């Protein structure tokens, strides 16, 4: 692929911003992603220009794994497949000996179809379907989480030789998506569950927690890891062979240096001298920055100068929306869009074009299908121009629906900003 070469790192039309927030990535990531989009739009009639498309940089995934092992060398990542089940991501991480966090039979089947051994899978769903539990037993996926007695009973009946990981209650109030109200046993409940498991002859091998997705407070790990040590010791006293600590997910590439520093300190503080295997379940950390989404402008609406609605004077309508790739925009602001002209040219930095504020809508007939409000973009934007959105790889394409008859599939162009990952194209 021409845009997956070293030469593209020197292109002169980089727009402002960098799609890669990893310290191990450079301008080449920016260049080849933009080259891929430009090349796509320059194709006259080989594809349906009415549909959005994506560009995935596998070099980003590769480099973020290197960054992880540099900052947290004693914590093995188990990629959260739910975040983005793209097989290319799975292939890269599998080749780097990553583990995988799966929540269902389908996810386990997917990663094992890519050559992942069952020993490198954690069935990290505290409340599992019986059929999925039976599939795990048949496939040899022994490590799994639980947080209640009913789940223990289910496992006792169908997979008594499983290696159990007790999910403890933890929370970061600053996280975008909290999980504490749905999963996690309190300290008192954890002790009772350890005793129950022992009396039933079940083997608890470790403790896990999840402070929430897209966590922002590095200090939230201190209390969670301290509590994990207390439950870990309770398991040892009960007679379990405790040897695993799972610190969950929620990591963002943006603040990972601070997060990693806090985690290293907490592990040294609470698990110093303990023979323990430490794992984590990062998802968006690997996937978010790997994907850029390009959307076409299919409509523009401008109110009359005397219109009383000052807030919605200028509107753009895209061929993707919150029922598609932008579903997370319902819960948090999405990335700032950048401009790609219908000709395939990027909007120049030195443009003297006037800007105005737009409301950006998705293509459906639902009034809540709003991608963004009050976004400053060039006044000259027109139908058939394109906007592109960086960092769209997490919880986006995998959640896309076919509501209103719009396609849920997104064509994806694969490339690599690092030659070491070119073999996965």
Curated annotation (Swiss-Prot):
Cellular localisation: Cytoplasm
Keyword Metal-binding attached: no
Cofactor(s) this protein cannot do without: pyridoxal 5'-phosphate
Signal keyword on record: no
Alphabetical GO biological process terms: putrescine biosynthetic process from arginine, via ornithine; terpenoid biosynthetic process
Root EC class: lyase
Binding site for substrate: 331-332, 366
UniProt site (Stacks against the aromatic ring of pyridoxal phosphate and stabilizes reaction intermediates): 210
Main location: cytoplasm
Active-site residues, as the UniProt record annotates them: 365
Record pathway: Secondary metabolite biosynthesis; terpenoid biosynthesis
Subunit structure: Homodimer. Only the dimer is catalytically active, as the active sites are constructed of residues from both monomers.
Family indicated by similarity: Belongs to the Orn/Lys/Arg decarboxylase class-II family.
The protein's name: Decarboxylase flvG
Originating organism: Aspergillus flavus (strain ATCC 200026 / FGSC A1120 / IAM 13836 / NRRL 3357 / JCM 12722 / SRRC 167)
Gene: flvG
